[in-house]
A protein has these predicted regions:
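Short, low-structural-confidence N-terminal segments
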Residues: 1-91, 191-223
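Charged, solvent-exposed helices and adjacent loops that form client-binding or oligomerization surfaces
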Residues: 65-95, 114-185
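Alpha-helical scaffold segments that flank or form the walls of functional sites
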Residues: 97-100
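Solvent-exposed helix-coil-helix hairpins and adjacent flexible coil/strand "hinge" segments
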Residues: 172, 181-182, 186-195, 202
Length: 223
């Protein structure tokens, strides 16, 4: 009887562990509600973290770019474009990857700019203000700021950091006898620079950002 009782306890324990693992897997696969998850860490580079609040600009920007293409492809059902398989995976996954790569790129050059004491001039400030106006207008037209849970101040902070990053990217390129575009996030010289850094993407959080359905509603249509 004691042996049977012990076996029963072990079997129950195994079942409970399997149920917990299954529940965790389902949670990790479930899209998160972006505006409720702003403090979640999406990535880290050189001991600096990027939360979903920090990533919000990139989500809004990348979704807008892809949505314009999706509406050309199929105005009635843009989700078809977002769900399309392309080089590198499905379009929504590629968009997610691109947004993260842009954010890591800008954060790295921002860190380097701060280390070198880079300052913004009046032209930089004007360009930054124009970029903020364009982004915020596009975002609020689709009520994206509500979906992302960010304020204009949050967007301005990110765009300002991007301005510093872009300015130092130009300086860094000149120092290495390269062009500005050589250090775009897709290019080999930048990728080699990135490999020298200590960085990590928190895929448990980032993969739950449902690109195409954060600031837009591109749910699959029923037949």
């Amino acid at each position: 009887m004691k042996l049977k009782h012990l076996v029963s306890i072990v079997l129950i324990a195994i079942v409970l562990v399997m149920l917990m693992r299954n529940n965790n897997s389902m949670t990790n696969a479930r899209p998160l509600v972006y505006r409720e998850s702003l403090d979640e860490v999406a990535a880290q580079i050189n001991d600096e973290t990027l939360t979903l609040r920090d990533m919000a600009f990139y989500v809004g920007y990348e979704e807008y770019q892809i949505q314009q293409e999706a509406l050309v492809y199929d105005p009635d059902d843009p989700n078809r474009y977002w769900s399309m398989r392309v080089e590198g995976g499905f379009m929504n996954a590629v968009a997610r990857k691109n947004a993260m790569q842009m954010a890591l790129h800008d954060e790295l050059f921002y860190q380097m700019a701060m280390k070198e004491g880079i300052a913004l001039d009046d032209d930089d400030q004007k360009h930054m203000d124009n970029k903020l106006e364009d982004f915020w207008e596009d975002l609020t037209e689709r009520q994206g700021e509500t979906a992302l849970g960010i304020s204009r101040k949050d967007a301005k902070k990110t765009i300002q950091r991007i301005a510093y990053a872009q300015k130092y990217q130009e300086v860094y390129a000149q120092l290495h006898n390269r062009t500005y575009d050589d250090y775009a996030y897709t290019e080999d010289p930048y990728q080699k620079l990135l490999k020298k850094q200590k960085y990590k993407v928190n895929n448990k959080v980032w993969n739950r950002v449902s690109f195409g359905n954060v600031t837009y509603n591109n749910k699959k249509k029923e037949d």
